[in-house]
Amino acid sequence: MKLLEERIRKDGEVLDGDVLKINSFLNHQVDPELMMQVGEEFKRLFENEKITKVLTCEASGIAPGIMAAYQLGVPMVFARKKKPSTLNDAVYWADVFSYTKKVNNKICVEKKFLSSDDHLLIIDDFLAHGEAVKGMLNIAKQANAAVAGVGVVVAKEFQGGSDWVKEHGYRLEALARISNFENNQVHFVGEK
């Protein structure tokens, strides 16, 4: 998605050699117009898949997830990182390690929101090592839900998560595919 790549070049910041900070339009402040276009692109890519729900993870997956769900005309469910007191004990759990925050999280989804009747589209902001996506796939498996594919706003292709998703037989669509960072500059797959 050319518009997204341009925005990453303009406003993105490479930190510590392998972290991309895009807080000005996705991970802290959200650009709703850009997210609407992200949702439209996910719809274009997955509209023939008979999606029944979008599954994402709080917090930064919510903006692209809700826009994709809106465009597809289906509900969005987000995995919570902490079980609130209002959630009953009937939940699916998965362990997720955050490389950015260097912490282990348990994510959960209430069982009544996912079932074997569902055909899920998993959406997330980033795919690096793939831990969040692996956790959501684990939850989908516990629910016996089918997974139509995985859509990510940004894939850091050099960190292994993209390969893992594809090697495990899942369709992967990334709107911006980063091949590497060099001299604090972002390089996209396919660039010369």
From Swiss-Prot:
Pathway: Purine metabolism; XMP biosynthesis via salvage pathway; XMP from xanthine: step 1/1. It comes from the Bacteria. The gene is xpt. Converts the preformed base xanthine, a product of nucleic acid breakdown, to xanthosine 5'-monophosphate (XMP), so it can be reused for RNA or DNA synthesis. Xanthine binds at residues 20, 27, 156. Its EC number is 2.4.2.22. It catalyses: XMP + diphosphate = xanthine + 5-phospho-alpha-D-ribose 1-diphosphate. 5-phospho-alpha-D-ribose 1-diphosphate binds at residues 128-132. Belongs to the purine/pyrimidine phosphoribosyltransferase family. Xpt subfamily. It is found in: Cytoplasm. GO terms for cellular component: cytoplasm. One of its GO terms (molecular function) is xanthine phosphoribosyltransferase activity. One of its GO terms (biological process) is xanthine metabolic process. Keywords: Cytoplasm, Glycosyltransferase, Purine salvage, Transferase. InterPro entries: PRibTrfase_dom, PRTase-like, Pur/Pyrimidine_PRTase, Xanthine_PRibTrfase. NCBIfam families: PRK09219.1, XPRTase. This is Xanthine phosphoribosyltransferase. Homodimer.
